[in-house]
Amino acid sequence: MLEHIEKELLEHQKTFEKVWEELRFHIYTASIICIEALKNQKKIMLCGNGGSAADAQHIAAELVGRFKKERRSLPAIALSVDTSALTAIGNDYGFELVFARQVEGLAQKGDVLIGISTSGESENVLRAMEEAKKRGCKTIGLLGKDGGRIKDLCDAAIVVPSSQTPRIQEMHIMIGHILCSLIDESF
């Protein structure tokens, strides 16, 4: 069992080192997009499935509540939390539109949509990103593997260089925390 633990920790460390080497500028770019939107009284929307939905909720909570320091509440919403909207849209329009329909109803020009997908191929996240672009929103992808089709829809694509979902998810929440910390420093 100790060998398994060591293997997991070493894989995490290797992925972290790649993120450190390759993604600092992309994280910086994403933070600037978020900070500018929030300073212009715009909101941040986030979406994802499964663990990525949990990350979306976590990041939104850090912005609406607080992260490390006292500051005003910042407008952020995870599109995965409204079960009535999710089930109504899923039933009437299909699961691939559960986020896009919410973006259609909630997004205003200048808002930010952060789409989280370990594969970069989640159809409902992709459709939400397309809708956000149509509405004049900035788009940020927290992605994995090669970034998939979602990468091409992003103003800032943060693609974790790994094909292992657990490693990608670990980096996504760390990157989310870094974004929250950078946002904190601006308010």
Swiss-Prot record:
Pfam families: SIS_2. The keyword Metal-binding applies. Its main location: cytoplasm. It is found in: Cytoplasm. Keywords: Carbohydrate metabolism, Cytoplasm, Isomerase, Metal-binding, Zinc. PROSITE patterns: SIS. Its cofactor is Zn(2+). Pathway: Carbohydrate biosynthesis; D-glycero-D-manno-heptose 7-phosphate biosynthesis; D-glycero-alpha-D-manno-heptose 7-phosphate and D-glycero-beta-D-manno-heptose 7-phosphate from sedoheptulose 7-phosphate: step 1/1. GO terms for biological process: carbohydrate metabolic process; D-glycero-D-manno-heptose 7-phosphate biosynthetic process. The keyword Cytoplasm applies. Its EC number is 5.3.1.28. Residues 34-187 form the SIS domain. Zn(2+) binds at residues 58, 62, 169, 177. Belongs to the SIS family. GmhA subfamily. HAMAP family: GmhA. Homotetramer. This is Phosphoheptose isomerase. The lineage of its organism: Bacteria, Pseudomonadati, Campylobacterota, Epsilonproteobacteria, Nautiliales.
